[in-house]
């Protein structure tokens, strides 16, 4: 968070996948105290700098629908680039989350969507994710009696001239982020750290290509995997491909972190589903406490992994 010579408040994002309304409320309280000490009582514009990722980020397999799993990746966004809403008894749109106000910017997008309730994503075409973040921050700043007279718009930080007000780091560790994306199978969250890693290794702006290069290099050079194809980080694209044996090798390396996966009885696992494809992979314990890695990939339409898992349970008890 920066202040420029024109008294504009500038925000630069670095791809935090778990930035939520509650964080903006906290940030606004911290900023209000800092601003009070600097004798600044008002700002002109809120300027959004989302240039850490190259725009637009096109993920193979993701469409331009309003579904949450099709949310556009960006270096600055809030609430997974979605808004959750419903109608009250008077037929008026309201927020479905008490911690998130339904601000006019979001309400206008909801009305144009033609949807009565649920979640919508912000436009891929108009780069609305950063603007929504800016408008939401404006709302919380005004609650802290900080006046803002200008607009919310895109722009850039000039680190040589702009004065830094606050550096905000995510409250979540990387392990916590991975646990959440595994729990909710969130395609959007999956690609955020991928793109950020690419930017960190090969320089910004972050791109999907740089992220894929980082992941592919690790898979080949460190895990020694062969004959695989990675085009994005979530698995939503049918162009991703890997054999069961190399997925097994990956699981062997991930074993120390298995507690991040969904856990039921003696099984840590992750499922995956595309049309005509069902998969399940993870770790399973037998009655003696022995731990096994397992991979099940079914590409026959109408078939599931259930019967195969029953056989695996029997095999490990022999």
Name each region found by the language model.
Residues 1-225:
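Conserved serine DD-peptidase/penicillin-binding transpeptidase domain
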Residues 226-318:
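C-terminal soluble interaction/assembly domains
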């Amino acid at each position: 968070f920066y202040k420029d010579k024109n008294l504009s408040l500038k925000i630069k994002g670095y791809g935090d996948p778990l930035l939520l309304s509650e964080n903006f409320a906290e940030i606004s309280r911290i900023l209000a105290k800092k601003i009070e000490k600097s004798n600044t009582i008002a700002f002109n514009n809120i300027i959004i700098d989302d240039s850490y990722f190259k725009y637009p980020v096109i993920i193979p397999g993701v469409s331009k629908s309003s579904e949450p799993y099709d949310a556009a990746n960006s270096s600055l966004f809030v609430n997974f680039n979605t808004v959750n809403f419903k109608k009250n008894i008077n037929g008026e749109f309201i927020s479905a989350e008490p911690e998130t106000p339904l601000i006019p910017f979001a309400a206008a997008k909801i009305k144009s969507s033609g949807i009565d309730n649920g979640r919508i994503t912000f436009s891929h075409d108009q780069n609305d994710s950063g603007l929504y973040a800016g408008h939401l921050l404006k709302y919380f700043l005004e609650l802290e009696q900080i006046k803002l007279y200008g607009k919310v718009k895109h722009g850039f930080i000039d680190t040589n001239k702009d004065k830094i007000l606050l550096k905000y780091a995510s409250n979540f560790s990387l392990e916590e982020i991975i646990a959440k994306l595994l729990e909710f199978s969130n395609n959007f969250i999956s690609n955020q750290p991928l793109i950020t890693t690419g930017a960190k290794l090969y320089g910004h702006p972050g791109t999907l290509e740089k992220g894929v290069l980082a992941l592919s290099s690790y898979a080949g050079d460190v895990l020694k995997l062969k004959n695989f194809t990675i085009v994005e980080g979530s698995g939503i694209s049918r162009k991703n491909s890997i054999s069961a044996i190399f997925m097994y090798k990956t699981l062997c390396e991930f074993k120390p972190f298995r507690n991040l996966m969904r856990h039921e009885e003696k099984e840590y696992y992750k499922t995956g589903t595309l049309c005509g494809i069902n998969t399940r992979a993870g770790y399973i314990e037998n009655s003696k406490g022995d731990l096994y890695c397992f991979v099940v990939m079914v590409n026959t339409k109408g078939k599931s992994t259930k019967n195969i898992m029953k056989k695996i349970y029997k095999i490990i008890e022999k």
